[in-house]
């Protein structure tokens, strides 16, 4: 059957969900399908069975396709560490750090890894559905591009262009894309899709005809807004504010500047008994929160300074005085200790940074990243998840571990109101989540994993109702 690529008119136009839904639709047709994204930029990484890293969106797409995630589904992952530099993960392994100004020169060497991973998927699966990054209209990035048209032309993969009508200006998005890209790039596009329409679709019939007349590209369909998308794991930080609920247990989470693996919160956001508040910079932690979760971060020391700049350290102290509780996950756990030592400068400049002092532990950063899937027990319940961090934490409070995986993990304060763990994904386990929420008097009867698959099935049905799926798949080569 071949391969087909979904590119977008911009970031966050719904490419990831379109590919996930198409993967599930292909699977329902009995097609052996695999997702692929040449280059992703995200601190929300998933750990593959062989201990590699890929973007969380590709892990969800793999689930939609009925596959275990593979490092070849996202061969280049950029994990921002500062506004101008990122860690570069190649085929699942951290390869180097690169400043934004230097990354262009590196991309020529990365194309080989991208094409190698793509070839592996293409030879082992009937159909490969490829997701682009950002937009091909970013012509300043076209030279040495590996994420959009540079890849599509190198691998000879036809493209469908997706525009987002919800943000407005979708006619200009699509027509403008054709106007600014190279004619040879435009020739790779086999049609367009309008995503996230609200209201009566017939009201946009004239707009769709105009796009066809101006571009010559076939109209492959208009996809109405899919409200259940909020129940699927988010990858982009831009999606964080969506998390909410109306339950009685109020959980607050500060939006750190380098927040990572925040999909840890998705099972909690799905709980009817939970109200989850994502607290943006410049806002105080809510005084009525029962629990504050300090999430993972790509830069523990940098985000600890950011946390203090927001005054959230003062808010945390007040929260504890009111009888609240605090849980730190990964980098958030490291922040809770007395000191973070980084003599070799693996997380910023060499030196030591005082922590929040809420746990009697100290953390020492190390060059080796612990990257592994684990299973163990916590609160008498089985837990599964993964670790993805640098550094090791030790101290008296580690004598009261948060979990056993099977070795002791994490720490708990003597009064039990402050705890930390290195374990990501622990809330996805229904038994543990129910036991953990039960400590707060909140009940849970949610089957989170089944809920994700139900939404993926509904997403596939939604696309099947509004797109000519068979025509789309016939474009693959």
Swiss-Prot record:
UniProt entry keywords in alphabetical sequence: Cobalamin biosynthesis, Glutamine amidotransferase
Gene3D superfamilies, per the entry: 3.40.50.880, P-loop containing nucleotide triphosphate hydrolases (3.40.50.300)
Gene Ontology molecular function: any one: catalytic activity
Keyword NADP on entry: no
This protein's record includes keyword Cell cycle: no
One Gene Ontology biological process: cobalamin biosynthetic process
Name of this chain's protein: Cobyric acid synthase
């Amino acid at each position: 059957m071949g391969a087909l690529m979904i590119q977008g008119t911009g970031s966050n136009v719904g490419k990831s969900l379109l590919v996930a839904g198409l993967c599930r639709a292909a699977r329902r047709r009995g097609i052996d399908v695999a997702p692929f994204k040449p280059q992703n930029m995200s601190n929300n990484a998933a750990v593959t069975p062989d201990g590699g890293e890929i973007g969380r969106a590709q892990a969800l797409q793999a689930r939609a396709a009925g596959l275990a995630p593979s490092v070849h589904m996202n061969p280049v992952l950029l994990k921002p560490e500062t506004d101008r530099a990122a860690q570069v993960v190649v085929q699942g392994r951290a390869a180097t750090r690169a400043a934004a100004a230097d990354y262009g020169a590196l991309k020529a060497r990365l194309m080989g890894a991208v094409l190698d991973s793509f070839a592996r998927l293409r030879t082992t699966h009937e159909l490969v559905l490829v997701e682009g990054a950002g937009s091909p209209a970013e012509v300043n990035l076209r030279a040495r591009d590996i994420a959009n048209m540079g890849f599509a032309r190198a691998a000879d993969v036809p493209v469908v262009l997706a525009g987002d009508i919800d943000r407005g200006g979708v006619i200009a998005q699509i027509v403008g894309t054709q106007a600014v890209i190279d004619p040879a790039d435009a020739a790779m596009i086999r049609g367009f899709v309008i995503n996230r329409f609200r209201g009566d679709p017939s009201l946009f019939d004239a707009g769709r005809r105009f796009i066809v007349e101006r571009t010559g590209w076939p109209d492959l369909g208009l996809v109405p807004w899919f409200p259940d998308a909020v129940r699927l794991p988010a990858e982009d930080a831009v999606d964080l504010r969506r998390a909410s609920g109306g339950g009685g247990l109020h959980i607050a989470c500060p939006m750190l500047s380098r927040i990572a693996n925040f999909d840890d919160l998705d099972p909690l956001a799905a709980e009817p008994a939970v109200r989850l508040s994502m607290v943006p910079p410049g806002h105080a932690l809510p005084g009525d929160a029962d629990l504050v979760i300090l999430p993972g971060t790509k830069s523990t020391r940098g985000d600890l300074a950011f946390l203090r700049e927001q005054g959230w350290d003062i808010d945390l102290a007040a929260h504890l005085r009111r009888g609240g509780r605090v849980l730190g996950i990964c980098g958030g756990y490291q922040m809770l200790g007395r000191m973070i030592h980084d003599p070799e400068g693996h997380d910023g400049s060499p030196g030591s940074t005082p922590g929040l002092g809420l746990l009697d532990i100290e953390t020492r950063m190390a060059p080796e990243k612990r990257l592994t899937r684990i299973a163990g027990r916590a609160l008498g319940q089985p837990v599964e998840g993964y670790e993805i961090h640098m550094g090791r934490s030790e101290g008296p409070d580690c004598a009261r571990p948060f979990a056993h995986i099977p070795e002791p993990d994490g720490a708990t304060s003597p009064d039990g109101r402050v705890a930390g763990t290195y374990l990501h994904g622990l809330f996805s386990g229904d038994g543990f989540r129910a036991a953990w929420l039960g400590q707060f008097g909140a009940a849970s009867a949610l089957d989170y994993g089944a809920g994700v698959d139900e939404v993926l099935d509904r997403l596939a049905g939604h696309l099947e109702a509004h797109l000519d799926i068979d025509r789309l798949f016939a474009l693959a080569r």
